[in-house]
Amino acid sequence: MTEELITPVYCTGVSAQVQKKRDKELGLGRHENAIKYLGQDYETLRARCLQSGVLFQDEAFPPVSHSLGFKELGPHSSKTYGIKWKRPTELMSNPQFIVDGATRTDICQGALGDCWLLAAIASLTLNETILHRVVPYGQSFQDGYAGIFHFQLWQFGEWVDVVIDDLLPTKDGKLVFVHSAQGNEFWSALLEKAYAKVNGSYEALSGGCTSEAFEDFTGGVTEWYDLQKAPSDLYQIILKALERGSLLGCSINISDIRDLEAITFKNLVRGHAYSVTGAKQVTYQGQRVNLIRMRNPWGEVEWKGPWSDSSYEWNKVDPYEREQLRVKMEDGEFWMSFRDFIREFTKLEICNLTPDALKSRTLRNWNTTFYEGTWRRGSTAGGCRNYPATFWVNPQFKIRLEEVDDADDYDNRESGCSFLLALMQKHRRRERRFGRDMETIGFAVYQVPRELAGQPVHLKRDFFLANASRAQSEHFINLREVSNRIRLPPGEYIVVPSTFEPNKEGDFLLRFFSEKKAGTQELDDQIQANLPDEKVLSEEEIDDNFKTLFSKLAGDDMEISVKELQTILNRIISKHKDLRTNGFSLESCRSMVNLMDRDGNGKLGLVEFNILWNRIRNYLTIFRKFDLDKSGSMSAYEMRMAIEAAGFKLNKKLHELIITRYSEPDLAVDFDNFVCCLVRLETMFRFFKLLDTDLDGVVTFDLFKWLQLTMFA
């Protein structure tokens, strides 16, 4: 029985987040049920084009200047002058999608600085199964050609099916960007276009890490090795990785931008991404030598040292072995000794597809879990541990380590539980055209003390002030992803992902990979309210001085209207020079009246005004307590603590909404907004409590009650 396909429903705002969660629970976003990117269905669009006889043109990524770029490749750039978008059928009489299978030589770099992407595409060709997860079968310029193609990419936890037309940027009749060595093969150029589409433009692909594309082609996770500190078994790690279909890339770091793509005297390119495509041991002068094979996406400029294409070392290798390993001259691919590799290159990236435990001698899969989260100014963007006043507001995740690694995994080291953490920031390439780029990100890991074990609560500031981290990312760095392999004793741990500085916004994906069974969960406070006692005083119980005050403030009807309440509160608050405030608005005063008005006449009598008066005095005490710097206003982070002190426990999303609604542009919250927020919260909680007659935390109401609640709360 075939699995039923889930069709996505397209929503906006908060409803979109709810719908997305439901879609995931139903399996949408798995590779076998990829999401139709931007709602475009390949089969439907292709059938429509074939029926109409019109070749497909993609309105979502049109053949215009802004699809090329925004600055270096922008509309008025000299680099885009003379570019024309043409289909392969316009460039030659017999274009091919793939000729005799996809190979590494199908990928030659053009005028775009996306060698990191092309190195990953070259590695992709080493594993046909993985290749055709990205490049679906059945595409051609002959049978059923309609000018439309599609590719499947992993994007931040879900697979998407990306539709493109085959209009490609050309200049003087030749492809401007990636092309095949043969010139008549177009799968790599079309894949590059699909990748440009999901990232917003071709220019957005300029500069990056090979691991980024590795992960988008596989959904795997990448580990980095500093070759200046290479582990003793790195060659075995590389052999295992290649055997298991992992994707590998390497590069030479630069310290000066002027060295970018500078060529060394042995013909290696600095700051340039290479694919690692093979590793082999050969017998040379009676000794076994470890070799490693690499490819330059340029399709030329090869290593000129030992074991290069024309080096004398090959003459002393067994002829059969030599023929098995020798590569063509100037095709961009070459061999070098592993010793030279360690000396010449500085960074190795391995994308583990499962991921497998590459450092273990036994083959096994890891348990994987991922969470999506956000950093929002004023609510969940607290910065790193250098900012103790706000660090605690970052999202928090718990991992429970239960089983230690097998004995042969840790040799003579202390036993522990291994896991890999990978923190990825989302959509940053798309945002480059708006002047935004990668934030500096990282994470810290804390052990949960025994007294807090098993409690799914968001840990507060005092905990982080009193406890040091047990592990952390090696660096805070402005890459799309940071990852670390960590080993800790069994127990519960809190992972805190963050940007380096506070108030840096972004969306992120946090992935856990554990070798043994491990439980994970996102920590958040449960929504609850400790509402003030609703005991109603009689007029006789109210202080005589307050009665005298009320009689002076109220009108002839001895009740206070919304307008009168506004006048009273603003007159009082203006006397408190230490408070930063714009005064109470008519709307906020109306909310207060709605909360306190027991008889429904839209005004406050003596008893009602007495309750409100005492409530505001209490709010003022709380406000002053949490205005830590005595600035007359609270910061958004102080507001979070003040709300809890007032009796309300809210989750991250609600804090986010409150800061959006009640803070000023500088994230300050003044007294009148603080009061309005607490009044609104109390009103909403009381409404819910009134409707929740069976106390199960769920209420059902009709449209009238919904409108009544939202219009007048």
Swiss-Prot record:
Description of how activity is regulated: Activated by micromolar concentrations of calcium and inhibited by calpastatin.
Top EC class, one word: hydrolase
Intracellular or extracellular location(s): Cytoplasm; Cell membrane
In-chain residues carrying the UniProt-annotated modification Phosphothreonine: 354
EC number: 3.4.22.52
Annotated residues for binding of Ca(2+) 2: 318, 323
General function of this protein: Calcium-regulated non-lysosomal thiol-protease which catalyzes limited proteolysis of substrates involved in cytoskeletal remodeling and signal transduction. Proteolytically cleaves CTBP1 at 'Asn-375', 'Gly-388' and 'His-410'. Cleaves and activates caspase-7 (CASP7).
PTM comment: Undergoes calcium-induced successive autoproteolytic cleavages that generate a membrane-bound 78 kDa active form and an intracellular 75 kDa active form. Calpastatin reduces with high efficiency the transition from 78 kDa to 75 kDa calpain forms.
Pfam families on file: Calpain_III, EF-hand_8, Peptidase_C2
SMART domains from the UniProt entry: calpain_III, CysPc
CDD domains: Calpain_III, CysPc, EFh_PEF_CAPN1
UniProt cofactor(s): Ca(2+)
Annotated segments matching region Domain III: 355-525
Name of the protein described by the UniProt record: Calpain-1 catalytic subunit
Chief location of this protein within or outside the cell: cytoplasm
Region (Domain IV): 542-712
Gene behind this protein: Capn1
Start and end residues of each stretch annotated as Linker: 526-541
UniProt KW keywords: Autocatalytic cleavage, Calcium, Cell membrane, Cytoplasm, Hydrolase, Membrane, Metal-binding, Phosphoprotein, Protease, Repeat, Thiol protease
Chain segments annotated as coiled-coil in the UniProt record: none
Cofactor: how and how many bound: Binds 4 Ca(2+) ions.
InterPro entries for the chain: C2_III, Calpain_cysteine_protease, Calpain_domain_III, Calpain_III, Calpain_III_sf, EF-hand-dom_pair, EF_Hand_1_Ca_BS, EF_hand_dom
Annotated positions binding Ca(2+) 1: 109, 114
Keyword Protein transport: no
